[in-house]
């Protein structure tokens, strides 16, 4: 009965975030203070073999890993996801923890380096004996970690939209898959008269796979590809590419650049005299946090596709935004991956309570069908592929760095990571 009451309360806990944030300074040993989060706990914790399991539990605490890029080119995006995950942990701890245990976060820096992500994931599972890990941003980091989680039977909660064509039994995907972001974004552009596409992305798996999908979609729906370019993460000179874009005269640049390359691209685009009135860009890795880093004056009028904005109108989001700002500062913003990281912690906690166990296999089994009243709206874990149902939203960046929603899907969209429901995508993957 006690567990049932906790589960019922979990779905509405986000609505109490303001109160919890206000008392956060008085919540003693919750292990989630930002200052404490930068270093791992003492290595004196007992070491035993095996993956995330009851060995993660010590006394009155259960250890979880948080693994994001806190340095390097991806830090512009990932630091704030870490912060939202720590906020969720603090809130859950203030409510009594999970199965009566306080959550103890162990934070590691992936340093925008994919082998480092794999190394740190192995450390968290094998040495720290964490029950689960919340982490990653780029698909390169996720794919580096994936074999480690599968080998050691660990559990990763990955909070960022990605290219699909994957469904690991050891990963829960709380960001959008392709049919919840990229495919509807292309449809939206085509339906609004944008037929000629220029594809610009960072040179790694997410942009490459996303653009492969987009090209098939354009062929099937009467669009036209007029250019395609890739640059390394951290690339800063876009003058040549901007000249190529001007020569190609596209209706839209579909932008899959990631990290601080977006700062250089949009500043140089404006320096070339090109504004959103001259050329539409639609980005899938720029949200409010990136707008804050780039400068909204460079982004005003450009489009984005996500599942959540700080302006999303739900009671849960109002509370989430207020709590996040109360903890981290009034100048901070929320954004889609920030919210997805926050939601991931709550979904894991709900699955643990439903399972009555921290063991990975039991948590995975219990997670299927769990619903949560998230800041973005209702989300549900799809037991078939461990992705979540999400509402699609197309938005326009405003002068203050916020995003005005222009369109949404009306209801949460079932995740289809292999695009099995799209005839034109039949040749893209043999995934099932």
Over which residues does each language-model region extend?
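An alpha-beta-alpha
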Residues: 70, 171-233, 252, 348
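Extracellular/periplasmic bilobed ligand-binding domains
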Residues: 211-305
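Bacterial lipoprotein signal-peptidase II cleavage site
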Residues: 20-35, 41
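Extracellular/periplasmic periplasmic-binding protein-like sensory domains
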Residues: 269-342, 353-358, 408-431
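Beta-alpha junction/loop-to-helix N-cap segments that form part of ligand/metal-binding clefts
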Residues: 76-83, 95-165, 174, 231-238
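Solvent-exposed, acidic/polar segments of extracytosolic/periplasmic ligand-binding ectodomains
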Residues: 52, 374-432
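Extracytoplasmic "Venus flytrap"
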Residues: 54-58, 62-84, 108-115, 137-140, ...
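Periplasmic-binding protein-like
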Residues: 124-136, 157-159, 198-201, 249-259, ...
